[in-house]
């Protein structure tokens, strides 16, 4: 299909073979913590959609205050938080037209082809804010944050973990590859992370050129 229109009939055996190849590729590059597809399948998915000039949104998910949380509670609990986020993405963005990927660490992406991308992101934000509270001590919950050492070695107060989501709507006629889409998504995520708390930022930029 292209833009949800059938282009013609294909060979069923070839189709099944291609689906099997994609499953093997996704498993080969899957993140060991969440078992979600990694960078290579993500990049291939974006390139494929651009080639088909398909309409899609990309949401880039990243955690706020994750390093101080790891420093205070340990990497095992940090891994539990990452798995929680992966489960929420699968539950609330797992439409058969969408693609969920784990870039690495606490970074995830969802390639949305479903029309409910904004409702999905907002639901994930709410569920994350609620679910992440179970990982904190009663004292830190009461204080709505914790004391830890920042990257400069200074003792500082950090709010509870937040989820930053940057969303872009790439123009498939002006974006030539996943590199450009990744740049757009990274800029949107950077804007979302300006807040220390959970936030959703939707970028108006559709390509990396001067004219948008």
Where are the model-predicted features located?
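The conserved cystathionine-beta-synthase
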Residues: 1-2, 16-19, 47
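A glycine-centered beta-loop-beta connector
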Residues: 1-13
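A short glycine-enriched loop-to-beta-strand structural element that forms part of the catalytic core
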Residues: 136-187, 199-205
């Amino acid at each position: 299909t292209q833009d949800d229109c059938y282009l013609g009939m294909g060979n069923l055996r070839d189709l099944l073979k291609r689906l099997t190849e994609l499953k093997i590729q996704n498993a080969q590059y899957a993140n060991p913590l969440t078992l979600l597809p990694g960078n290579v399948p993500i990049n291939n998915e974006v390139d494929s959609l651009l080639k088909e000039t398909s309409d899609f949104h990309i949401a880039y998910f990243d955690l706020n205050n994750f390093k101080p949380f790891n420093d205070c509670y340990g990497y095992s609990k940090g891994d539990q938080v990452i798995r929680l986020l992966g489960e929420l993405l699968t539950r609330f963005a797992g439409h058969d037209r969408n693609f969920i990927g784990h870039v690495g660490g606490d970074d995830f992406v969802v390639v949305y082809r479903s029309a409910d991308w904004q409702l999905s992101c907002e639901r994930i934000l709410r569920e994350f804010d609620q679910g992440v509270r179970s990982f904190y001590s009663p004292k830190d919950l009461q204080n709505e944050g914790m004391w830890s050492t920042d990257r400069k070695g200074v003792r500082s107060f950090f709010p509870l973990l937040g989820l930053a989501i940057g969303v872009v709507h790439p123009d498939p006629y002006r974006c030539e590859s996943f590199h450009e889409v990744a740049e757009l998504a990274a800029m949107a995520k950077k804007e979302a992370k300006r807040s220390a708390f959970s936030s959703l930022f939707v970028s108006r930029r559709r390509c990396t050129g001067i004219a948008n």
